[in-house]
Amino acid sequence: MKLTPMMQQYMDIKSKYKDAILLFRLGDFYEAFFEDAEIVSKTLDLVLTHRQDAPMAGVPYHALNTYLKKLVQFGYKVAICDQVEDPSTAKGLVKREVTRIVTPGTVLEDDLLDQNSNNYLVAICRKSEYSVAGVDISTGESFVVSFKDFQSMIDFLGSVKVSQVLCEPDLRQDLEKNLADIMIESLADWHLDDALLEKDIAEVFKVSDIDHLELGSNLKVFGALVRYLRYTLMSPCTLVKPPRIIRDQMYVFLDPATIEHLSLVGGEKGKNLFDVLNHTKTSMGSRLLKNWILQPLRDLYEINKRLDKVQAFVEDSILLNEIREYLQAVRDIQRIANRINYGKASVKDLVALRSTLQVCPYIKEVLLTNEAFPEAAMVDCLHDICEILNDAIKEEPSSVIGEGKVIKEGYDEQLDQLRELVYHSQEFLNNFEQRERDRTGIPNLRVGYNSVFGYYIEITKSHLSKIPPNYVRKQTLVNAERFITDELKEFEQKMLTAKENLERREKEIYDEICASLSSKVGLIIELAEFLAQIDVLSTLAYVAIRYGYTKPSFSNDGKLLLRNSRHPVVERLVDTFVPNDLEMDRTKNFIILTGPNMSGKSTFIRQVALVSIMAQMGSFVPADEAILPVFDRIFAKMGIRDDIASGKSTFLIEMNEVAKIVYQATENSLILLDEVGRGTSTFDGISIAWAVSEYLQNQISCKCIFATHFTELTELAKMYDGIVNKTVQVIEEKNQVIFLHRVVDGIADRSYGIEVAGIAGLPGEIIQRAREVLDVIANKSELEDKLRVISSEKLKKLKKKKVHPNQAQLW
């Protein structure tokens, strides 16, 4: 098939971007052809048409982002091919080039992003360790971190909002098995080339030397990342802030399973910790709050700094209310700054930046009334930028640049003249027409326009004798003649170029403004980070007041004391919540928690973890009193689940999770276990639960709460001084079970499973038969005798072995 020049142009460009969907600008549409068209048609539910027998599907250019969002969400890489010259002045085929490659990790536009989450592009390389570098180009944030083992790296990535991963080819298969629903792409050789690596990174940060960045062994992976960004953005990749160096001792370790089991983020709306705490006023604050939840601090000094500022807001209601009122006017200037940095800022962005800068002096002023915020004195409110935007941008500008409706009148004389010409032309024509009528004495003289002859003066034949000498005949009609004058011809010539010049001049001015702002991007980002922190701190104070939270304190002797503690999420979902106490220390650090179904065991152990996380992120906590140790890691293994897609059974998944905990926990960790050993036979389950408990107590000596229906495990309290038995109270009245949800010392005498089955609505005959069967098998004395003769001394002699986490599934 012989191709037209345009289709040949398409094929030539497509050959360079075989791994991407190519959206090819044709007039007012972006078109996809061949296999790309079939993907676009199916994904976007668009009609598939044909051009020269080639499948074709297109989207309107003005609605590109709407369709682009869906393609990116489905994990496609999209190459945007634009017309890079004006079709009206092009000689022959319009020149076209790919101007940008859009992937899940290289999105800048607001309507393609989640306002409450970061959007990290991550690169991974392996030498002696796994080196990881991440960049969120929408906010300008970046980080580097290293891991000794694969599983620790996977766990970290599960706690970061990663949307795309770049990796060395030999890592791809393992990553695809462990990172579901994330786009994974192999790095090319040129991404990893050592040549000019330091120079490329220096260009990103606009510095001459990169030693101060402290990239160390992460130099290569960070270089690969910025080279990929430069390739996809089709422009220099620039980052204002140096990457954050993440070290092991900075944050509490929370693996993906723990994040899921504790419902920290995600899941059903209103039923996770983030949704309960998120009363932020800004998108920047919302993202920061989520990061604080997922990365609680381990540095006690930094924790207390946050808590003291929250307390200052709690104790100063006037300050709190004023700050939250002002923050309502603050927009997402963090992402706006980065769009300015990459030349992608819209008129809407500049208006949002202006409204934020207008309120910043008031935020600074009110913060300085409280001694808890001395850093506010150093905040640059960027008055010069605000002044530029006030002078240049209309109060309610058009979103379209080039119509003369963005730049204020009086800002640029040339633009004002062009605007006057374009938008007041009718006034000129009316005045001209009346003036000519008066001058010629022709009452029905009319000025008109058509696309063939342009502007003209029309005079009926009955008045032709009155035509002045300067009138030049242009067209003859049946009953009239049309004329032109030098003045009208000059006006016409101006009008032909005025709209074009208006569009060009307003765009020039807009680009000049954005260029002047680009030198201030670093300062805008600093201001954005400050405002985001104030938003989160004031929000935590607002939540503390609203929900009755208390400022926690921290012990250095391992003491954990909670008085009337509550589950922050569950208490928002029920009419009445029963608070509970808890006391642990280094001598009593392991609790076996028994109790019936529906009694609240799982809620209790979750709330202990949530209170600890809230405290270490710098939040007040739902309790009357809270004294806590600083935990280095928090693990939660709650319930059991299948993973049919990977072929893993309930029990295997459970054992994998427990093995990971055993190998990664330290004496400063908090472990919460719920129903370990339930996925296999009773004897096997009890034996495993028993052995795990002994190992955690004897070898790790961390704080652990183990909720179980295996009452046999309560025998451990007789064998080990550090283990304590607790239960959740239940009473029976008139053949009804009443759950008190109160945790007390003791052991549950039964599970009340049959009673719960009755509450669930099982037929009466099934309930009755269950009682009969229970009477037959209730005698457990033989099993208990067998367990008591287990030689605990053998287990105590076990030494904690250094086993690679990848071997966990063999445990």
Curated annotation (Swiss-Prot):
Disulfide bonds: none annotated. Coiled coil: none annotated. One of its GO terms (molecular function) is ATP binding. ATP binds at residues 595-602. PROSITE patterns: DNA_MISMATCH_REPAIR_2. Pfam families: MutS_I, MutS_II, MutS_III, MutS_IV, MutS_V. Keywords: ATP-binding, DNA damage, DNA repair, DNA-binding, Nucleotide-binding. CDD domains: ABC_MutS1 (cd03284). One of its GO terms (biological process) is mismatch repair. It comes from the Bacteria. GO terms for cellular component: cytosol. SMART domains: MUTSac, MUTSd. HAMAP family: MutS. This protein is involved in the repair of mismatches in DNA. It is possible that it carries out the mismatch recognition step. This protein has a weak ATPase activity. Belongs to the DNA mismatch repair MutS family. This is DNA mismatch repair protein MutS. The gene is mutS.
